[in-house]
């Protein structure tokens, strides 16, 4: 989806935790009336319209492992194991889960009888979409963020972009458009997701910088932001053993509308 260039830096300082809280009513997005297509990690998946799954009192949930290393994870929702053996940087397709108050639990793959390494409580709303991210917080502890996916289309001729900062040792991040040095996002804290933002649809190069600094740590080249599409840039790594990396996710509403709405 785009090319990465990592620039070595020294003296990276972690910021204090600003964790996301998964609560009822935290999402203002409406269920989509169209199916969605997702491209991530070279794989494409399709999910039904939000309004279609709402008729069954279900929500749409996908899982991303943003914890650098070799550990693969299983994710549970209440008593059901919903995703298994998910490796680092892998994004699962959307799956339908009950729209209810419940508990997400994260375990190393295959360790079903052990205590979870992270827990997140909250409510899934009928017909809405969520990305659950396994990451480390600013103190290096495993955590789960349940992030609403507002896949309402961007303005005419625009693309939408958001950033998730899962690089726990990197600290605050700025994302800058290289061509005109325009900040798209500033001061994105660790363990935080921005809202989607409308941007010009164009091929561009983006720089990721430590908050308030002028020198890029990561350059994202050949970023082709297409009109009507929605992009998530997940920052991860940035440790002594794993360089700062970006996991790109591309979503779009398909032309077809699910029947039975």
Tell where the protein language model's regions lie, with residue ranges.
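Sec-dependent bacterial lipoprotein signal peptides
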Residues: 1-24
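Intrinsically disordered, low-complexity polar regions and short flexible loop motifs
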Residues: 26-261
């Amino acid at each position: 989806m785009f090319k990465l260039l990592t620039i070595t830096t020294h003296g990276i300082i972690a910021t204090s935790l600003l964790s996301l809280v998964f609560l009822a009513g935290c999402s203002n997005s409406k269920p989509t009336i169209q199916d969605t297509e997702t491209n991530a990690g070279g794989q494409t998946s399709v999910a039904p319209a939000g309004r279609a799954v709402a008729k069954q009192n279900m929500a749409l949930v996908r899982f991303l492992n943003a914890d650098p290393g070799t550990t693969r994870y299983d994710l549970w929702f209440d008593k059901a194991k919903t995703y298994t053996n998910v490796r680092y940087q892998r994004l699962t397709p959307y799956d339908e889960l009950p729209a209810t108050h419940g508990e997400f639990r994260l375990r190393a793959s295959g360790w079903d009888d052990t205590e979870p390494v992270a827990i997140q409580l909250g409510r899934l709303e009928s017909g809405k979409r969520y990305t659950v991210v396994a990451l480390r917080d600013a103190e290096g502890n495993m955590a789960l963020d349940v992030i609403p996916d507002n896949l309402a289309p961007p303005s005419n001729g625009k693309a939408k972009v958001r950033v998730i900062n899962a690089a726990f040792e990197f600290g605050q991040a700025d994302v800058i458009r290289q061509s005109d040095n325009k900040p798209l996002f500033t001061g994105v804290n660790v363990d935080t997701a921005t809202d989607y933002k409308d941007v010009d649809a164009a091929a561009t190069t983006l720089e990721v910088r430590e908050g308030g600094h002028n020198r890029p740590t990561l350059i994202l080249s050949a970023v082709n932001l297409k009109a009507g599409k929605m992009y998530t840039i997940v920052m991860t790594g940035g440790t002594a053993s794993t360089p700062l990396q970006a996991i790109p996710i591309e979503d779009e509403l398909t032309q077809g509308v699910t029947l039975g709405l």
